[in-house]
């Protein structure tokens, strides 16, 4: 039960912070405003985070909350590739609608220069567990190639998604991330289809 409360408190802080970052900008958001918006205390904030900068690496937590919500809506009779495209579309729409390009760029920057954990690569994240489940089922159903390991497919798929987000940041959000991914992702994922299926 303590773990659930910990996740709830930390999650409230993260959700409030990213909402404020989006609404008023990262630089114009204070720790006091985050604490007030989250309905938590300053002590709780500093229990989980060294400061506001530490929240930059928490975006993966927000992504995983979205994946937790989405995994309940996945259709088991859809192909593995269709499920990946669905998850991608929903996450990229969330990014477009609630995370500024500047904040996403800061996340990538913080992950590149950190000496600590690189949360985006954490294999214990909901994201990686969900990918593994979808891809294993896809291989078992004969939808996906068997000459590639699940780990290889996960690594290249995650790299592809990060690359799409990174390019979107480089282009300063000049195009729809979700629409572009909707067009290119099926072509890129076709390489994983079992040609005999």
Segments from the language model and where they lie:
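Basic, helix-initiating cap at the start of DNA-binding domains
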Residues: 1-24, 28-40, 54
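Short hydrophobic/aromatic patch on the recognition helix
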Residues: 39-49
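Alpha-helical DNA-contacting segments of helix-turn-helix folds
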Residues: 49, 56-63
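Short coil/turn segments at alpha/beta junctions that flank glycine-rich nucleotide-binding fingerprints
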Residues: 23-27, 77, 98, 141, ...
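Amphipathic alpha-helical packing segments from all-alpha helical-bundle domains
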Residues: 68, 115-143, 151-155, 159, ...
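Hydrophobic alpha-helical connector segments
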Residues: 58, 72-98, 150, 154-157, ...
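Amphipathic alpha-helical segments used for helix-helix packing
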Residues: 95-115
């Amino acid at each position: 039960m303590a773990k659930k409360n910990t996740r709830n408190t930390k999650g409230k802080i993260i959700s409030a912070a990213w909402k404020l970052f989006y609404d008023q900008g990262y630089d114009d958001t204070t720790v006091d405003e985050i604490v007030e918006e989250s309905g938590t205390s300053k002590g709780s904030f500093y229990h989980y985070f060294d400061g506001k900068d530490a929240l930059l690496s928490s975006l993966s937590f927000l992504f995983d909350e979205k994946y937790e919500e989405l995994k309940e809506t996945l259709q088991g009779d859809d192909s593995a590739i269709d499920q990946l495209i669905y998850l991608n579309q929903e996450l990229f729409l969330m990014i477009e609608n609630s995370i500024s390009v500047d904040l996403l760029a800061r996340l990538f920057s913080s992950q590149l220069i950190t000496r600590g954990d690189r949360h985006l690569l954490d294999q214990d994240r909901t994201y990686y567990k969900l990918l593994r489940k979808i891809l294993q089922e896809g291989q078992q159903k004969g939808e996906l190639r068997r000459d590639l390991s699940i780990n290889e497919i996960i690594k290249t798929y995650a790299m592809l998604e990060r690359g799409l987000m990174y390019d979107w940041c480089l282009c300063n959000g000049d195009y729809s991330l979700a629409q572009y991914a909707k067009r290119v992702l099926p072509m890129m994922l076709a390489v994983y289809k079992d040609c005999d299926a």
